[in-house]
């Protein structure tokens, strides 16, 4: 898939200097690696690590953007995170990599952008975004709305 995406990260003071209102703050991020023959394991580690770093539980996350290059990969992470069934309507609410595409160089930027705009739309406080571990490496972030 072809795509391009960008988002701007800056300090709160820089945003204020420029008269900009932040869409969200990066509360915590984590990366993890594991056996590249079993990519979801890296995602599992990163998702759990970012929750610990943020001091949050899975029940406090209002929206999830979990990159879904393969359905089994996403399902593995959903189950390993023990996301409650009544929270499934918070996962990939606008589609996923299977339906939206998976442009490798732009995927995470696309997911972050989708997440923070959906958080604003729904007045959500916390959102989690991540790649489940293609090649054995995963990166996950938790964003918080002001």
Describe the role of every protein-language-model region.
Residues 1-146:
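Claisen-condensing/thiolase-fold acyl-transfer catalytic domains that form or cleave C-C bonds
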